[in-house]
Each structure stands twice: as C-alpha cells, then as structure tokens.
Amino acid sequence: MRTLCSLLLICCLLFSYDTPVVGELKHLGLKTEFEQCQRIRGYCLNTYCRFPTSHVGSCYPEKRYCCKNIR
C-alpha cells in the first residue's frame, strides 16, 4: 500500500507542473498541428477566418485558426 501511494504521489507531482519533459511533449503536438495546416496549404490566424477563406482546422491549442482560401 505504501508503494502504491508513493507511486501515485510521484505521478501527481510530475504531471501537475509544466516540467521540461511535459513542455517538450506539448511543443511536439503544436508542431504537428502547424505542419498539418501547412500541408493542406492553409495559414494560421489569431482571429476568425475572414470571408475569402474558410476555417479548416486549428494550428495550436491556444485558439489559433487554420484558414484556407475558398478558391
């Protein structure tokens, strides 16, 4: 029981803070979403996509939009 509690405490402490390991994993996810937007020939905006474009996905979890021309 003591071992289980110790492991649970270690896991909670590791994942409760933005440690360098968790930060690196976050950046890997951001890079792949950005690359996916670039692959479909889109571009990233901080605001909503305007009229000649359409919203086709996201670039980052921080509410950035992947927009693509309608043509």
From Swiss-Prot:
Record keyword DNA damage present: no
Family note: Belongs to the beta-defensin family.
Name of the coding gene: Defb9
PANTHER family: BETA-DEFENSIN 10-RELATED, BETA-DEFENSIN-RELATED
Predominant subcellular localization, coarse grouping: secreted
Known function: Has antibacterial activity.
GO annotation, biological process: defense response to Gram-negative bacterium; defense response to Gram-positive bacterium; innate immune response in mucosa
GO molecular function: CCR6 chemokine receptor binding
Places the protein is found: Secreted
GO cellular component, one term: extracellular space
Disulfide bonds: C37-C66, C44-C59, C49-C67
Record Pfam families: Defensin_beta
Name listed for the protein in its UniProt record: Beta-defensin 9
Signal peptide: 1-23
Entry keyword set: Antibiotic, Antimicrobial, Defensin, Disulfide bond, Secreted, Signal
Coiled coil segments of this chain: none
